[in-house]
Amino acid sequence: MKLKLKNVFLAYFLVSIAGLLYALVQLGQPCDCLPPLRAAAEQLRQKDLRISQLQADLRRPPPVPAQPPEPEALPTIYVITPTYARLVQKAELVRLSQTLSLVPRLHWLLVEDAESPTPLVSGLLAASGLLFTHLAVLTPKAQRLREGEPGWVRPRGVEQRNKALDWLRGKGGAVGGEKDPPPPGTQGVVYFADDDNTYSRELFKEMRWTRGVSVWPVGLVGGLRFEGPRVQDGRVVGFHTAWEPNRPFPLDMAGFAVALPLLLAKPNAQFDATAPRGHLESSLLSHLVDPKDLEPRAANCTQVLVWHTRTEKPKMKQEEQLQRQGQGSDPAIEV
């Protein structure tokens, strides 16, 4: 029994010595585990660097987008607006001026129905930030609406629109703003924008490249949801209208634009104050174009981008009552 235990102990001792010698030998061998460790460390370093860059980007304020320069080749839109003194005049003109301010390369020709410019309109134009020309001409008494007459009985704004056409043709008359007319050869388009309508800025994109006379529908006019040209195969073949459809050009004043070179080439083309009711637009267009040559815009006249809106006349009963008591609103406050 002792012999056997001695042998077991000896065997255990020899195996232990062999294992120890093997371990000592392995400690002296080169290790190939360093390259993976170096690669992992580099990946961590790159991730830390990327995180630092992202944190710096988040702290940096966003860059202000650069405004593209206004292309000089873009034709100018000359917007002719007749206006007259009334309680809602300033409100109408503020709304219109802020729409026009969204349109690049636009020149506003604002024509007062007055002998001379008024401070209200002069101040509004100066504050508008628009390129403008201020004109004034009084409507003759024989052409003015009489008390109680509806607005459609007599054509309105005739003298004022013709005054603006005269200025474009170099006949002067400006009382404020830009006083020199466009030089010969100027590419542009002329649009007649009443001060009480509602305009989408998309409308001005549609008209800008007019070659002759461009046309489109007008909403809320003529007792209809809209009036406008009927188009087939890209050409105007008729008009959707209910009142006197046989007029030469059954269009609303807001429903067309004219190329400036065409107007300048036809010096006698203007609005006729003696034209029959509803024929004012035709009195100008008949000098400029044949109906078959009209240029349909607004997706072949299927989009309404201008509306013939009207601001309700304010009721001033309380104001009149206070005025009789000597307590009316301060007249020095412009409304």
From Swiss-Prot:
Transmembrane segments: 8-28
EC annotation from Swiss-Prot or TrEMBL: 2.4.1.135
Pfam family, one: Glyco_transf_43
Biased composition (Basic and acidic residues): 312-322
GO molecular function, one term: galactosylgalactosylxylosylprotein 3-beta-glucuronosyltransferase activity
Entries under CDD domains matching the protein: GlcAT-I
GO biological process: carbohydrate metabolic process; chondroitin sulfate proteoglycan biosynthetic process; dermatan sulfate proteoglycan biosynthetic process; glycosaminoglycan biosynthetic process; heparan sulfate proteoglycan biosynthetic process; positive regulation of catalytic activity; positive regulation of intracellular protein transport; protein glycosylation
GO cellular component assignments: cis-Golgi network; Golgi membrane
Active site: E281
Disordered: annotated segments: 312-335
Superkingdom to which the source organism belongs: Eukaryota
Binding-site residues for Mn(2+), renumbered to this chain: D196
Keywords for the protein's UniProt record, in alphabetical order: Disulfide bond, Glycoprotein, Golgi apparatus, Manganese, Membrane, Metal-binding, Signal-anchor, Transferase, Transmembrane, Transmembrane helix
Tissue spec. comment: Liver, brain and heart. Moderate expression seen in lung, skeletal muscle, kidney and testis.
Pathway: Protein modification; protein glycosylation
Subcellular location: Golgi apparatus membrane; Golgi apparatus, cis-Golgi network
Membrane topology recorded in Swiss-Prot or TrEMBL: Single-pass type II membrane protein
Residue spans, topological domain Cytoplasmic: 1-7
Cofactor: Mn(2+)
UniProt topological domain (Lumenal) ranges: 29-335
Recorded catalytic activity of this chain's protein: 3-O-(beta-D-galactosyl-(1->3)-beta-D-galactosyl-(1->4)-beta-D-xylosyl)-L-seryl-[protein] + UDP-alpha-D-glucuronate = 3-O-(beta-D-GlcA-(1->3)-beta-D-Gal-(1->3)-beta-D-Gal-(1->4)-beta-D-Xyl)-L-seryl-[protein] + UDP + H(+)
PANTHER family: GALACTOSYLGALACTOSYLXYLOSYLPROTEIN 3-BETA-GLUCURONOSYLTRANSFERASE 3, GALACTOSYLGALACTOSYLXYLOSYLPROTEIN 3-BETA-GLUCURONOSYLTRANSFERASE BETA-1,3-GLUCURONYLTRANSFERASE
Annotated function: Glycosaminoglycans biosynthesis. Involved in forming the linkage tetrasaccharide present in heparan sulfate and chondroitin sulfate. Transfers a glucuronic acid moiety from the uridine diphosphate-glucuronic acid (UDP-GlcUA) to the common linkage region trisaccharide Gal-beta-1,3-Gal-beta-1,4-Xyl covalently bound to a Ser residue at the glycosaminylglycan attachment site of proteoglycans. Can also play a role in the biosynthesis of l2/HNK-1 carbohydrate epitope on glycoproteins. Highest activity seen with Gal-beta-1,3-Gal-beta-O-R (where R=naphthalenemethanol or benzyl alcohol).
Sequence similarity: Belongs to the glycosyltransferase 43 family.
Description of how the protein assembles with itself and partners: Homodimer; disulfide-linked. Interacts with PXYLP1; the interaction increases the 2-phosphoxylose phosphatase activity of PXYLP1 during completion of linkage region formation in a B3GAT3-mediated manner.
Name of the protein this chain belongs to: Galactosylgalactosylxylosylprotein 3-beta-glucuronosyltransferase 3
Organism for this UniProt entry: Cricetulus griseus (Chinese hamster)
Taxonomic lineage: Eukaryota, Metazoa, Chordata, Craniata, Vertebrata
